[in-house]
């Protein structure tokens, strides 16, 4: 991360810390890795809330924010460096990199999560986490709280309240910063270019997936590595199916083509729908 973005993420964490109750901990889990086939995963996309607060894009990670802590207010649990796995799957930041590059006060191995979290959460009154995230973090939190309860004789006090982080973060993300608006405009500009390219390329006899390819090319050429959602490219009757995604029929002379497609650029999505004649000529 450059210094500007590093500061932006830090400011977001501070703003969030001001919005939660005293004696609270904030837990945000990374998105899950999704297998495509036995030895290949789908392209990884970080959880939006996780990225918004850290800029960290690796899987198998967890953010812990403790606003009232004297020393370790922001902790990242992440994967260890592993030369063999990195040769196969790419570079890993590791704990040292998480501190130096992402501004964590400390970073620990994700393998030590279950061992360390009960101690880090003991004495905290409130735990905030996303109740809508499909990460299974709620089960983990219940496990950590039970581990704390087992040590109450040693003076450990378990958290009293589990609270939803969703509404607080959504309210924060609703108000866009200047650089966010620039990224949104960039996403819209790329999508505009893609729609113009498709309108110029469409011709009777093309298949819907070939027209879709014009969009994917324009997205990738401009640094938007994926569409924001499954593109809808339908000609004729298919254009009347609200969420048509097969995109495998021939585009015929005299038909209208409807395309609902937008790119995602650095976690910001665009969404544009246009309808135009397959033969390039509107009727009078």
What are these regions (language model features)?
Residues 69, 198, 268-269:
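Short amphipathic alpha-helical leader/targeting segments
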Residues 1-193:
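A composition/biophysics-driven feature that prefers long, compositionally simple stretches
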């Amino acid at each position: 991360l450059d210094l500007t973005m590093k500061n932006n993420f830090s400011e977001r964490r501070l703003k969030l810390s001001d919005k939660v109750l005293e004696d609270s901990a904030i837990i945000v889990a990374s998105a899950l890795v999704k297998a495509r086939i036995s030895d290949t995963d789908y392209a990884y996309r970080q959880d939006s809330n996780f990225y918004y607060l850290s800029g960290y894009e690796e899987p198998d990670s967890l953010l812990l924010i403790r606003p009232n802590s004297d020393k370790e207010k922001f902790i990242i649990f992440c994967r260890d460096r592993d030369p063999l796995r990195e040769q196969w799957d790419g570079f890993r930041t590791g704990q040292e990199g998480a501190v130096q590059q992402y501004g964590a006060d400390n970073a620990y191995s994700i393998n030590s999560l279950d061992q360390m979290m009960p101690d880090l959460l003991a004495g905290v009154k409130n735990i905030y986490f996303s109740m809508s995230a499909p990460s299974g973090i709620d089960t983990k939190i219940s496990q950590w709280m039970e581990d704390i309860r087992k040590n109450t004789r040693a003076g450990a006090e378990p958290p009293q309240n589990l609270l939803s982080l969703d509404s607080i973060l959504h309210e924060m993300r609703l108000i866009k910063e200047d650089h966010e608006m620039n990224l949104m405009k960039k996403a819209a500009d790329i999508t505009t270019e893609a729609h113009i390219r498709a309108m110029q390329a469409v011709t009777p006899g093309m298949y819907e997936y070939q027209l879709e390819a014009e969009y994917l090319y324009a997205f990738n050429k401009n640094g938007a590595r994926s569409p924001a959602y499954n593109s809808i490219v339908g000609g004729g009757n298919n254009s009347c199916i609200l969420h048509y995604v097969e995109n495998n029929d021939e585009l015929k002379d005299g038909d209208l083509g409807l395309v609902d497609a937008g790119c995602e650029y650095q976690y910001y999505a665009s969404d544009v729908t246009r309808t135009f004649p397959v033969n390039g000529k509107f009727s009078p």
